[in-house]
Amino acid sequence: MTASDLLTLPQLLAQYSSSAPQNKVFYTTSTKNSHSSFKGLESVATDATHLLNNQDPLNTIKDQLSKDILTTVFTDETTLVKSIHHLYSLPNKLPLVITVDLNLQDYSAIPALKDLSFPILISSDLQTAISNADSSYKIATSSLTPVFHFLNLEKIGTSTAIEQDIDFPTLEIANEETKVALSEATDSLTNFELVKGKESITTVIVNLSPYDAEFSSVLPSNVGLIKIRVYRPWNFSKFLEILPSSVTKIAVLQGVSKKSQSNEFQPFLLDFFGNFNELVSRNIEQVVLTNIGNVNDYGNVINTVISNINKKEPDNNLFLGESNEKAEEQAEVTQLISSVKKVVNLEDAYIKVLKQLFSSNLQILNQFSSETIEPSNPEFGFGRFLKQEAQREELISLAKTSLDPSLYLSEDANKIVQLLSKWLSFNGRDLDEAQLQEANATGLEIFQLLQSNQDSSTVLKFLKIAPTSDSFIFKSSWLIGSDAWSYDLGHSGIQQVLSSRKNINVLLIDSEPYDHRKQNQDRKKDVGLYAMNYYSAYVASVAVYASYTQLLTAIIEASKYNGPSIVLAYLPYNSENDTPLEVLKETKNAVESGYWPLYRFNPVYDDPSTDKEAFSLDSSVIRKQLQDFLDRENKLTLLTRKDPSLSRNLKQSAGDALTRKQEKRSKAAFDQLLEGLSGPPLHVYYASDGGNAANLAKRLAARASARGLKATVLSMDDIILEELPGEENVVFITSTAGQGEFPQDGKSFWEALKNDTDLDLASLNVAVFGLGDSEYWPRKEDKHYFNKPSQDLFKRLELLSAKALIPLGLGDDQDADGFQTAYSEWEPKLWEALGVSGAAVDDEPKPVTNEDIKRESNFLRGTISENLKDTSSGGVTHANEQLMKFHGIYTQDDRDIREIRKSQGLEPYYMFMARARLPGGKTTPQQWLALDHLSDTSGNGTLKLTTRATFQIHGVLKKNLKHTLRGMNAVLMDTLAAAGDVNRNVMVSALPTNAKVHQQIADMGKLISDHFLPKTTAYHEVWLEGPEEQDDDPSWPSIFENRKDGPRKKKTLVSGNALVDIEPIYGPTYLPRKFKFNIAVPPYNDVDVLSIDVGLVAIVNPETQIVEGYNVFVGGGMGTTHNNKKTYPRLGSCLGFVKTEDIIPPLEGIVIVQRDHGDRKDRKHARLKYTVDDMGVEGFKQKVEEYWGKKFEPERPFEFKSNIDYFGWIKDETGLNHFTAFIENGRVEDTPDLPQKTGIRKVAEYMLKTNSGHFRLTGNQHLVISNITDEHVAGIKSILKTYKLDNTDFSGLRLSSSSCVGLPTCGLAFAESERFLPDIITQLEDCLEEYGLRHDSIIMRMTGCPNGCSRPWLGELALVGKAPHTYNLMLGGGYLGQRLNKLYKANVKDEEIVDYIKPLFKRYALEREEGEHFGDFCIRVGIIKPTTEGKYFHEDVSEDAY
């Protein structure tokens, strides 16, 4: 094979590594984040395995070597020398090439391998490197012998293109019969080269340093130079052949990194003295070795070398030049330390848990320190522990013999003896946290008594052995194992710990990502199996980003266990620069796949007399190795009894994805057979994220069947590539994801098709239709993203010789009918090409719409009850998905693990989100505790405070869904109408400063919510009727039945004595789209009152503090579709003022007008804002007034001054206290840094105990602890401080930010939101401090899609997700929620966000006017133009935005 493109030297070496068909490539670096010194290697050897220098890489490689596979290793001399013990154990019969970069110029590493029997080639220039690369691979494959190739990349160069044709050989790996002898394979090599020198020279320099060319250019006429090209085999006869007979002195030069302190002969010099007799016969008088460091004056070095060798007694330990500690090496060390510190920050997720649980009782025996790296290894820490143990044993021994009061000349003698006896009883026991505290209090008291009673020899003996109180203290002792700074070579430290049976704990952190699992055979997770076989060790496998609760349990159990404990902790990262979010995603994939199972093994319970099991499985999937262990120990049956679903999970985890794929295809074929069709086959495959492509494919297949074709329809994920050529007629339909990417269920197929060069599709007829949006990426340079998957697929199929039935079809969302415009032309051409265009076809049923689903649902019942009982799937049908929204439930799946489950042949990990209806945003401590409990037992362990001041419980499995809703209703909190095409939760201002006004608007919120609550009895019937086995309390059904308000329990009696459901306001099809009310109280607009369908601005009499009425705004709404100019956000328009006592009828009129005039055909045009614009504000107002029978009064004046929450304590006019706690993005959870969920639970318990206070939720996703009397403020403050809820010292930007849920649970999200925004703000806070903006409030919003849940279009600064890792940056929103923003920059990548925002903040800091807000500033200085009205949202966007 000839190189057609110009390659650099590292790329050429990588190209050689693939010379044999079966090959493996490994390369090592100092950190995960750093690139190989063989620059460009990864671009050629794309499947190369990356290993770290400090993790014994040769041990990993050694286990993967095979005589049938050509293996190449790229490393450096330091890593190689450290692995020399592995090199000696390498078998001879291996095709292995180890290419070594002498990056420290330390050529002494080469003679260090002199006793190996393997060829060693040395390259000091480009041509030699090319020649030796060729030779090394030919020798390795022909003789089955490992070969070492040393070169100096810095000297030769890594970036210069090689401008010559290289014939890369295709090598066959020899076998025992065909292999040649090593001597034959190496015989033709040029071992030595006389670079310069005539027959008359008297001295020759043998150079083993990087300076061949430099030294040869300054040699005196009587001196020659020989360079070494092949060091092993050492062929001294070839050396003598080129050595001029006139030479009497040999100066050997060896490149080293620093001067040696040893005077011993160097190994390289011994090569010459090994042939001493031949030297004597050639009249060689002197052989002297000189070590060469970093050299600049080459002539001076040569003169010094020659002068030294001509002395009668030359210096045999001469070192010339400078130690080779270059700036680059210093930079590498600095980078290494920096990388390790970044890893330590990631590992803090575990270390903080230890510190929180054990605080002053924690002892970490080895910790990272950049100054003293060596003592951080586990062996050192264990040695330190053993020393402490020996001292403790001596102390115990003395205490046991000192229990006689007469030994103490003190009145405290009896007390000392009693305490010593008690202290002794604590030794050798399992101590829980309380016992640990008691034991340490006892030890401290003993030491204090001994110090104050030093009148006896016994006391002096104690103080000699135990000079400090620490000697009496009981610690939870931990060793930390880290891939970055505390690597346990061969797990020797673990073996010592287990063998010792000492009471010590090991936290072993594994950083290997799931997708690298095949690269490393020596996995830490397997240490768990090894440790469990000891039967005397506690073992746990944990993952902080998978199950925080399980981690806490394991750490506590490990510390309590009296013996060795091994806690395997997962923290996967691909780079030291990875964020916690990236670690979280990797963790979820590994746990879900079963690669990293969560479990605990406690030998204390490995006893038939106990009713507990020694092994506890905390995740649902385990792999074969762990299963085999359990089978062998006969514990699997116990596990299965405890968790009946386990056996099914085990079977799933062991299944083969290909088998499942074939089963699915077989079913499709069987269905086709049952139809008894006689026409030609048509296989329809789709790739779809949002469902459009899938629905279109299913519709096409149905139409094909109606025309007599044998049609099947499957996801592209179900294609078996090898069977594709025989499928005759195939249609591919794909939507477009991200930046022109295939949807999730098409990626695997596309990668396989793209990389298969042998596939012949000449017998296949194909058609392709794509769904895209030509304006989604508006920039000219991004236009190629439009329908890129379908276009790429069509070209690839043609390249593989497939025959196109019809031209490629490209659907465009910008067309009048969306993708249907192009599809309606494309489909008839397909029928014509297949010869069925004239077939008689019955009228096709119209597609089922949401309006159909509502109409046929029997007042929101559908088949929800039946679906809940169906255990064959974790999800529900599409129709029930839509109906369950009316019940406050959204179907979700964990998108972080969607791909890994797909690869296993499993359906998405379906789960549900339950949203509470909470008018007024007010909740009791009983309700909070119930939600907290439900989130732990049925949800994902967190609570979400939403941007509409209510709760969401995420991660509820279908089997727990009814229990969750019943648990909420048991505390009089329902979910009816929390979503769906009805009025949803009514949000009101939190208003902690004014109790009287807040009570009025809270009452109004409840009145509106109750008035517009659906009157169907379906909710009660489906979720609440009768008792359930899962009920926590038998009284639940009676609570449901006796509740006076909430969901209706009985149907309405109509004529004919029939009991039916009636919806007097909504009717049987409810509203065209969702509908919301907000209530604001000037000067506070913390609910963004103009952003919603109906906004009520309370007009308060300043003297009486009575709400006299409301200004009514209609037509607000945030939802849009990217680049679809028919959709836009809109602020509400004022219809006028209405008195408080008259408010319900006009509100009902607004709902009725929307019900009757809203667009029920196009859901993207169905919100009230479009109805108002279509009818005109005045036209809409007239319709409402017609229904109401009255006129709106003129709008009353008001002024907003604030849009944010105010944090900390405040007292209202009644004397009650309120504390607003900062809950970032509304996610209430326990983390190592912020145990907020536990803290708020403690607050709720305190409220319940003292009968004081309640909670309020704010529209900015924060929490107000309300109505606390003065006597209980101190108690609440203590709890807040303990659980870090009292911290409000955040930047103004962070305090003013909010975010939607986004990935991974929201099905609409294109990009990260809640999990990413805190990281962005953290990156910005340094510059805020620098610019003097730390305390300035800037409204920042972030969403994963354009639907607007966090009201991003009102943000002064907003990021709206457009594709994975891609956002639109919006600027210019009004600080008071009074103005929409506008697009500033489209398609901003994750890593670009901060770079775009920083200059804006800097300019704002320098040029703003007094009191000017950021959004106003952006408009005043012309950074962005104002959005004057929603319908003009897409206008006046700068061309630079795209």
UniProtKB/Swiss-Prot annotation:
UniProt keyword annotation of Flavoprotein present: no
Catalytic activity: hydrogen sulfide + 3 NADP(+) + 3 H2O = sulfite + 3 NADPH + 4 H(+)
Gene3D superfamilies: 3.40.50.360, 3.40.50.920, 3.40.50.970, 3.90.480.20, Sulfite Reductase Hemoprotein, domain 1, Sulfite Reductase Hemoprotein,Domain 2
Pathway in which this enzyme or protein is active: Sulfur metabolism; hydrogen sulfide biosynthesis; hydrogen sulfide from sulfite (NADPH route): step 1/1
Domain Flavodoxin-like per the UniProt entry, residue ranges: 682-831
This enzyme's EC code(s): 1.8.1.2
4Fe-4S recorded as keyword: yes
Pfam families, alphabetized: Flavodoxin_1, NIR_SIR, NIR_SIR_ferr
GO molecular function, one term: heme binding
Cofactor note: Binds 1 siroheme per subunit.
Binding-site residues for [4Fe-4S] cluster, renumbered to this chain: 1300, 1306, 1345, 1349
A biological process term (GO) from this entry: sulfur amino acid biosynthetic process
Keywords, sorted A to Z: 4Fe-4S, Cytoplasm, Heme, Iron, Iron-sulfur, Metal-binding, NADP, Oxidoreductase, Phosphoprotein
Cofactor field: siroheme; [4Fe-4S] cluster
Stored PROSITE patterns: FLAVODOXIN_LIKE (PS50902), NIR_SIR (PS00365)
GO CC aspect terms: cell periphery; cytoplasm; cytoplasmic stress granule; fungal-type vacuole; sulfite reductase complex (NADPH)
Subunit structure: Alpha(2)-beta(2). The alpha component is a flavoprotein, the beta component is a hemoprotein.
Reported function: Catalyzes the reduction of sulfite to sulfide, one of several activities required for the biosynthesis of L-cysteine from sulfate.
Protein family (similarity comment): Belongs to the nitrite and sulfite reductase 4Fe-4S domain family.
Protein name listed in UniProt: Sulfite reductase [NADPH] subunit beta
Originating species: Saccharomyces cerevisiae (strain ATCC 204508 / S288c)
Gene it is expressed from: MET5
